[in-house]
Each structure stands twice: as structure tokens, then as C-alpha cells.
């Protein structure tokens, strides 16, 4: 686990929610099952195979050492999630988790939940994708070129919030989970862009009429119409 320990020891004090270590990226085969995220003020360690108590103690000690340097006097707050063979479990390892828990990414507020469930409300490994969407939409400020976005598998609609902040005319968010879309509505409201969005549970009615599909296809690039998680 040395690559993870090195990442912890060298990390700077994060302000935004961000991924600190991405073992699944393939650069460190011995740590391919691990990721470390920061959802301020909580650290989230995820393992895709069971971890021993000794391994967790070593990681916790590494976090404690670095956190005492980055935030002297502040309690280390962290949780461990194990995802293995289709099951997911989460343990509070230290401190506490805010409720409600809001984080920011490049000035955008998102509601997250790191204490239970498999997903946390914001996929930090898609931060670069959200930056791309922001740049794409901002590059089309004129009324005739402003895009309308179809956000498939929208989850909690982070891409929608970013697109609307960047100037999109409208975003339609589709997802099977009404609960996730409800959090998405909170995210839009918290960022002042609720008026520009609509939310559709794909189980409640047909996805889109033919005319609606034509309307979106005429205003979006192929890369924006592809399925993307928030």
C-alpha cells in the first residue's frame, strides 16, 4: 500500500471535494482496489476487496499524521467503505459525519452522503468531465448557439448544475431513481439554477418523443448526448 501512503504524506490541504488517490486508474497495481476521497470535512477510503484491521489501522495512522500537520487541533473524520462481491458496507472510523453534508467543487455546492449507501452523491473521478462540460457550454454564449442538454443517468444532476451555471438554455435530467433526482433538485436550488432544469424519472413515462429527440440532437454535440453519471 506504499503508493497510498505516499499520496497521503504528500497531499496538500484540500478545500474542495476531490479524489486524492485513484488506485483503480491502473498506475499502482498493488493498490488497484483502493481510492481515497475528501468530502470536506470527511475522508472516505473505499476498498473493492476486504481490508484487514491491521491495514485499516495503518491507513488511519497515516491519515492522522498528515491531518495533524494540515489541520492542527482538528479531529480526523473518516469512514471506510468496502465494496465486494456486490455488497457494500460503510464504517465510521473516526470523528463524525455532518448531516446534512454539503461540499463544494469549483464553487458549486453539492449535497452528499458518505455515511451509508454505495454512492455518495458526487462522483469525484468525474471532476474533469464536469470541467469539460462547463468549457463546452461557455464557448457557446450567443442565443442561437446556447445548448440544451440531455443528462442521461443523471443521478444527482451535478453535470446539469454545471451546464446551467455555464449558460445552457435548459437541461433535462433523466434517471431511474426518484430519490437521486430529488437530491439533484436540492443541488440546483442551492446553486440558484433550478428554473433552468427539468427532472424525469424514466420509470414514470416514456423517455422522449421523436420531436424532443430531434430537438436535442440539433443543439448538442454527440459527446454531450452520451450517457454520463453525475
Descriptions of predicted regions:
Residues 1-42, 48-49:
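Non-catalytic accessory regions of SAM-dependent methyltransferases
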Residues 29-30, 35-37, 56-127, 131:
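Non-catalytic substrate-recognition/targeting regions of SAM-dependent transferases
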Residues 132-144:
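Glycine-rich helix-loop-beta junction characteristic of Rossmann-like nucleotide cofactor-binding loops
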Residues 143-155:
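Conserved class I S-adenosyl-L-methionine
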Residues 156-168:
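Conserved SAM-binding loop of SAM-dependent methyltransferases across substrates and taxa
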Residues 170-175:
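Conserved SAM-binding motif I beta-strand of class I
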Residues 179-220:
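S-adenosyl-L-methionine
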Residues 220-230:
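A short SAM/SAH-binding and catalytic strip from SAM-dependent methyltransferases
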Amino acid at each position: 500500500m506504499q503508493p497510498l501512503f505516499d499520496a497521503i504524506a504528500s497531499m496538500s490541504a484540500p478545500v474542495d471535494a476531490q479524489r486524492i488517490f485513484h488506485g483503480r486508474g491502473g498506475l499502482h497495481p498493488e493498490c488497484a482496489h483502493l481510492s481515497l476521497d475528501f468530502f470536506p470535512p470527511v475522508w472516505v477510503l473505499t476498498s473493492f476487496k476486504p481490508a484487514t484491521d491491521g491495514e485499516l489501522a495503518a491507513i488511519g495512522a497515516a491519515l492522522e499524521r498528515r491531518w495533524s500537520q494540515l489541520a492542527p487541533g482538528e479531529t480526523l473524520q473518516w469512514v471506510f467503505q468496502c465494496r465486494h462481491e456486490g455488497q457494500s458496507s460503510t464504517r465510521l472510523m473516526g470523528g463524525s459525519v455532518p448531516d446534512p453534508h454539503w461540499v463544494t467543487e469549483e464553487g458549486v455546492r453539492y449535497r452528499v452522503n458518505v455515511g451509508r449507501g454505495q454512492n455518495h452523491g458526487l462522483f469525484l473521478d468525474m471532476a474533469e468531465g464536469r470541467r469539460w462540460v462547463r468549457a463546452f457550454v461557455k464557448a457557446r454564449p450567443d442565443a442561437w448557439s446556447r445548448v440544451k442538454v440531455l443528462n442521461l443517468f443523471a443521478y444527482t444532476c451535478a453535470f446539469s448544475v454545471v451546464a446551467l451555471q455555464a449558460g445552457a438554455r435548459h437541461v433535462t435530467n433523466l434517471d431511474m431513481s426518484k430519490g437521486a433526482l430529488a437530491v439533484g433538485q436540492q443541488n440546483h436550488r442551492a446553486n440558484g439554477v433550478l428554473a433552468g432544469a427539468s427532472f424525469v424519472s424514466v420509470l414514470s413515462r416514456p423517455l422522449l418523443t421523436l420531436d424532443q429527440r430531434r430537438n436535442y440532437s440539433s443543439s448538442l454535440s454527440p459527446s454531450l448526448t452520451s450517457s454520463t453519471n453525475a
